[in-house]
């Protein structure tokens, strides 16, 4: 059974099923092995409540899973062409992407982030590497950074000239990798508790939740999801009212979720 396999072997099978013949099996298996070099322990908090620890990667962020696999994937498919990764970050994406792509040949990374609105540790994690990693502090909030990224992707000539690509959650390779740790969470539960699982997901851009929904669609026995947000609650308000009405982003202690 899939849930009885170790993380890497299980993830190779999951991603192999999702990616199909787009990559040779041996190549994909090696990519997963190189990307998932750390664990995601499921720790019991109290009766029937568990926490999946996704901070054991090199930048202490859950996005290490997606970032490292995405770097492996782009390196495998780019051929002889050069790629420029342009991404906006509210903290954890920048660190994970910078470390995942650092030193990869013919891949440059440009990271936009809101000045003064991410933790000092996160800023040091991606602003001190140099090499093929470039960072730009924007005197605005995360949504303004994301708007600049979207504007760049709307420029067809720019996309073609520099081989523009994204490391945000619009890049499916990142989400596919994140699917794997939902399986890992359920696999670590006692067998008698695997049939009635409710997963609470901290949500900013809702990419992590999307990965969970993909896992459920693949057959993972998850009963339902809880999307946990902070004061930046555009999506919950939309689900209640049907009106899409983003507000000015509020700075909170959970800065990686500060997305309007």
Describe these PLM feature segments:
Residues 1-260:
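PLP-dependent amino-acid enzyme catalytic core
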């Amino acid at each position: 059974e899939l849930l009885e396999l170790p993380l890497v072997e299980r993830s190779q099978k999951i991603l192999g099923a999702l990616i199909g013949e787009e990559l040779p099996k041996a190549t994909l298996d090696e990519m997963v092995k190189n990307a998932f070099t750390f664990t995601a322990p499921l720790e019991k908090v109290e009766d029937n409540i568990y926490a999946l620890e996704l901070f054991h990667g090199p930048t202490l962020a859950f996005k290490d899973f997606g970032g490292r696999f995405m770097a492996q994937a782009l390196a495998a498919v780019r051929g002889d062409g050069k790629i420029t990764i342009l991404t906006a970050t509210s903290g954890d994406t920048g660190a994970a992407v910078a470390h995942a792509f650092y030193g990869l040949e013919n891949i440059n990374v440009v990271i936009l982030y809101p000045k003064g609105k991410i933790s000092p540790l996160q800023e040091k994690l991606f602003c001190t590497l140099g090499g093929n990693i470039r960072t730009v502090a924007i005197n605005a909030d995360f949504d303004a950074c994301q708007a600049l990224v979207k504007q760049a992707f709307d420029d067809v000539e720019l996309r073609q000239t520099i081989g523009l690509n994204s490391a945000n959650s619009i890049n499916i390779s990142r989400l596919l990798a994140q699917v794997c740790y939902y399986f890992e969470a359920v696999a670590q539960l006692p067998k008698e508790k695997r049939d009635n699982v409710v997963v609470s997901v901290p949500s900013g851009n809702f990419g992590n939740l999307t990965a969970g929904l993909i896992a459920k669609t693949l057959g993972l026995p998850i009963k339902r999801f809880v999307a946990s947000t902070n004061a930046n609650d555009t999506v919950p308000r939309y689900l209640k009212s049907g009106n899409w009405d983003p507000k000015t982003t509020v700075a909170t202690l959970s800065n990686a979720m500060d997305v309007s």
